[in-house]
Amino acid sequence: MIATRFRNFAAWLFAATLLGVGCAVAQSPPSTGPTQILITYRSEPANRPAFRTYLQRDMLARLEKLKGEGVLSRYQILFNPFTTANTWDAMTILSFTRYADTLRWQQIERTQPGGLDAAGLRLARPVNTYSADLPWHGEVDYPGEQGNGVYYVIPYEYSSADQYRKYVDAYVLPQVTGWMREGVLTGYRIFMNRYPVGPLWDSLFVYRYRNLEAFGRRDEVIAKVRQTLVDQPEWKQFSDIKQTIRTESENTIAEALQPGGGAR
């Protein structure tokens, strides 16, 4: 079993290298505090256009300032182009340079809940804040035009973190590599909630598709790639029991906002 698992992983890693995919594989729990904070927001339908503009004009500028100061290593605001009852209107993803830098965000929260100042709070409200780790992520060398990307966000709950890590390594990552090989997926991030207590997500997948056409091929490509993996014993084992490992909740299609009214 160990030899088989190593061969499967080596094959996946070789394919990822050929694709130019930067990847991270989680083998053990993190040894420091979480450096990722994710915040979701809800806005009344009448306020959504103004809230979108506020995020692009004001919020992104404040986050860029924090990045310039070295507090953030990366940030992103995703906006749901549709009004949906059971998800969110916007989500901010903050990647901090160090765990200690998250204290700066706590200070901001004292006067700007969820990072929103008074003007922002008139347009929307922060709903949930998650402290998370980012054990798995990757991106192709040439992801295409930023403004064309379509983001697909999938929350999961699981019963065992250790089993879930093995599931992602053996079942999810080989498929993700295949989707990248097919040219439809240009990047992915898989977060794990550091404090998964209560009816919140334990793991959050954020996929970036090359464009709307590529996103439309999602089901076709999933089926095609799975056919190439079905003869791998470890992949097949997790495929057969995946429903006992995790539970999926409502997905969100989103665009990444950028200054000036576009998406990225």
Can you say where each PLM-predicted feature lies in the sequence?
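Bacterial N-terminal signal peptides
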Residues: 10-21
